[in-house]
Regions:
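Short beta-strand segments
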Residues: 41-43, 66-69, 116-121, 180-186, ...
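Glycine-rich oxoanion-binding loops at beta->alpha junctions
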Residues: 69-111, 152-153, 157-158
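An N-terminal, well-structured beta->alpha segment
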Residues: 1-41, 49-50
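Accessory alpha-helical/coil subdomains and C-terminal extensions
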Residues: 158, 179, 201-282, 286
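Internal helix-turn-beta structural module
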Residues: 323-409
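Active-site segments that bind and position negatively charged phosphate/pyrophosphate groups
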Residues: 262-339, 347-348
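Internal gly/pro-rich beta-alpha loop/helix module
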Residues: 133-219
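A glycine- and small-aliphatic-rich helix-loop capping segment at beta-alpha/alpha-beta transitions
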Residues: 53-62, 80-83, 103, 107, ...
Length: 409
């Protein structure tokens, strides 16, 4: 199983390297014409790396700027750019203060000026100017993360509680031109949902927001409920958008890495949005069914699963997926299943995801635990830590969803 685990590491490392935003940002900026001042605003988990690439490409054409990213994701200083770190997945005071700085930088611009807006996943929490008290927004965010809502439902509500989401940041920047380079972390690349669409016309409606609030029985103040009933901007005439990077590229890179190692890869889907533990069980069962096929196989899926919080443990969707798969492949000597977040973080943990092999369940039992006990408590992190199956990469500098693979030798 050691060789299989090394194969897994090679595959997820190469896949993530293939979707780092550096070259993609440079391509997006190639040939772009910025006649006046250029103000850089980068928000999201990949913001630092995207901004660094932009400064490398444009140099002194950038007058000033700000990077807003997650704690631990800034990788040093960038000449002429202020770097701020803030809270994720729940916004904190640093999220609010950094947004105020960005709003100040982009006030009173002219039609000749350009806001170079570099956006990636995580921006919903990191770049925030709430229309309700900050503590109330934090509570609503926590409810949304715990209730099992998908990312579109979550961001449909977030947009209406913010002065910078749902196209409102684009309005703030007007009459300046906003040139947006967006790294997609949502299945299907809906630009108005990525980081809650600060510069994109909103395709959702107030009816959608109110329906989601009712569906999940959210506790809302009268002020918040009133904001959900208000429409967001439906046009953004001062914006040019270039989407770069996606989970499709991540899965394709994973498939190439599998072929490098002699596996025959099959991409099952690049738009997985099911419940993490159910997806993990299916992936593990599929690997088990093919355990005696005689040729190395790799089954790959990408997307963003959801976690239903039923306990008070620690973990993330990728860790839950891997642990659920462990129960299906217990005892198998020729199977490994892993699941990772391309940004290097999975839930409120220091792990990127998790891995399971045929011995994971046995090692878990030696720690006095079972998969059946751990998953309802959402405590996959501690379980995989006990079995030595956490995947820890550190912040990667990109963010294009998650991917998982089952390897069969």
């Amino acid at each position: 199983m050691g060789a299989l685990r090394e194969d897994a590491k090679y595959i997820y490392t190469r896949a993530i390297e293939a979707v780092l935003p550096d070259e993609a940002v440079r391509r997006a900026l190639d040939g772009a014409d910025f006649p006046g001042r250029v103000i850089l605003v980068a928000a999201g988990k990949a913001a630092w790396r995207m901004a660094s690439a932009a400064v490398s490409a444009l140099g002194e054409r950038i007058d000033t700027g700000i990077v807003i990213t997650k704690y631990g994701h800034a990788q040093g200083t960038i000449p002429g750019i202020v770097c701020r770190e803030a809270g994720h997945p729940v916004p904190d005071e640093n999220s609010f203060s950094a947004a105020r700085e960005a709003l100040a930088l982009t006030e009173n611009l002219t039609a000749d000026d350009t806001v170079l807006f570099l956006l990636s996943g995580g921006g919903s929490a990191l770049f925030e100017s709430p229309l309700v008290p900050g503590v109330e927004l934090q509570d609503i965010t926590a409810q949304l993360l715990a209730c099992g809502a998908d990312i579109v439902e979550i961001n449909t509500i977030r947009k209406r509680l913010s002065a910078v989401k749902g196209g409102r940041f684009a309005r703030h920047c007007a009459p300046a031109h906003v040139f947006a380079v967006i790294l997609s972390d949502i299945v299907g690349d809906p630009v108005d949902m990525i980081a809650s669409g600060p510069v994109s016309p909103d395709s959702s409606t107030c009816a959608d927001a109110l329906a989601a609030a009712e569906k999940y029985a959210l506790r809302l103040s009268d002020t918040a409920r009133g904001l959900l009933a208000q429409e967001t901007p439906k046009t953004a005439d001062n914006v040019t958008v270039r989407v770069t990077g996606s989970v499709r590229e991540l899965c394709a890179a994973a498939a190439k890495a599998c072929r490098d190692l002699g596996y025959t890869p099959e991409i099952l889907t690049d738009c997985e949005q099911g419940v993490a533990r159910e997806v993990g069980a299916r992936l593990g069962a599929l690997a088990r069914e093919n355990a005696s096929c005689g040729t190395p196989r790799a089954f790959i899926l990408g997307g963003e699963t959801v976690v239903r919080l039923t306990g008070n443990g620690k973990g993330g969707r990728n860790q839950e997926l891997a642990l659920a798969a462990a129960a299906e492949i217990a005892g198998a000597e020729n199977i490994v299943v892993f699941s990772v977040g391309s940004d290097g973080t999975d839930g409120p943990t220091d792990a990127a995801g998790g891995l399971a092999d045929g011995g994971t369940v046995e090692r878990l039992a030696a720690a006095g635990k079972t998969v059946a006990d751990v998953l309802p408590n959402n405590d996959a992190y501690h379980a995989l830590r006990d079995t030595g199956d956490l995947i820890i990469t550190g912040p990667t500098g990109t963010n294009v969803n998650d991917f998982a693979a089952a390897l069969v030798r």
